[in-house]
Swiss-Prot record:
GO MF assignments: hydro-lyase activity; L-carnitine CoA-transferase activity
Organism: Salmonella enteritidis PT4 (strain P125109)
Protein family: Belongs to the enoyl-CoA hydratase/isomerase family.
Protein name as annotated: Carnitinyl-CoA dehydratase
Keyword match Lyase: yes
Pathway where it operates: Amine and polyamine metabolism; carnitine metabolism
Free-text function comment from the UniProt entry: Catalyzes the reversible dehydration of L-carnitinyl-CoA to crotonobetainyl-CoA.
GO term, biological process aspect, one: carnitine metabolic process
Keyword Chloroplast included in the entry's annotation: no
Active site (record annotation): 111 (nucleophile), 131 (proton acceptor)
């Protein structure tokens, strides 16, 4: 594993810290290492939730490493099968990822956060997609994911001028889930991770699968699709041991013991 990444396992929770001073910028080598970490997380049955954060208190990530670019790394370089930062193009990850944004999330750093399922950020965090000012475009998910969260007027200003969005503004628009102090950031992310662990893993997988498949469908079409039998996790949930365990635990006034089957 790359020296730029620190991995910590806390039971079913994996913490990934990107540590590349000064700005946690990401070159192709680092992107490959991040992709390996996320794919291992996907494939490890003992892991349930991942938290991605940046080292230090100033930068979550400044995105693409412009020093590497100046040395010849092309904008369309191979960043690995998971896409830039290892997560932006993993489309079969049925476990939740939390971005704990500890500071500036610019360019590909913002796109990394957008690829997560939840964003918890520090009060000093801010978000921007300044690629147009560098002669490129935010094509690692920024131009695809941000329009699903914000009105066109806001998106256009952010992607065409590089305007920054503060943590509080991001919270108002629903781009982030929580804004906390820097000192509370990781505790808040871990609290959310534990809440996710408390939910049934098959149910979480089915929810992510349904979101991916039906997010652009009319409601009626979505109903037909999820009942058509083509989904992997949804039918499994309905006939799982966990589907029996949940109501049984509720009736017995105890915490459920999920088996993931």
């Amino acid at each position: 594993m790359s020296e730029s990444l620190h991995l910590t396992r806390n039971g079913p929770i994996l913490e990934i810290t990107l540590d590349r001073p000064k700005a946690n910028a990401i070159d192709a080598k680092t992107s490959f290492a991040m992709g390996e970490a996320f794919l291992n997380f996907r494939d490890d049955p003992e892991l349930r939730v991942a938290i991605i954060t940046g080292g230090g208190e100033k930068f979550f990530s400044a995105g693409w490493d412009l020093k590497a670019a100046a040395e010849g790394e092309a904008p369309d370089a191979d960043f690995g099968s998971g896409g830039f930062a290892g997560l932006t193009e993993i489309f079969d990850l049925d476990k939740p990822v939390i971005a704990a944004v500890n500071g500036y999330a610019f360019g590909g750093g913002f796109e990394l956060a957008l690829a997560a399922d939840f964003i918890v950020c520090a009060e000093n965090a801010s978000f921007a997609l300044p690629e147009a000012k560098l002669g490129i475009v935010p094509d690692s998910g920024g131009v695809l994911r941000l329009p699903k969260l914000l009105p066109p007027a806001i998106v256009n200003e952010m992607v065409m001028t590089g305007r920054r969005m503060s943590a509080e503004e991001a919270l108002r628009w629903g781009v982030v889930n929580r804004v906390v102090s820097q000192s509370e950031l990781m505790d808040s992310a871990r609290e959310l991770a534990q809440q996710l662990v408390n939910s049934a893993p098959l149910a979480i997988a089915a929810l992510k699968e349904i979101y991916r498949a039906t997010s652009e469908m009319p409601v009626e079409e979505g109903y037909r699709y999820i009942r058509s039998g083509v989904l992997k996790h949804y039918p499994s949930v309905l006939h799982s041991e966990d589907a029996l365990e949940g109501p049984q635990a509720f009736a017995e006034k105890r915490d459920p013991v999920w088996k993931g089957r």
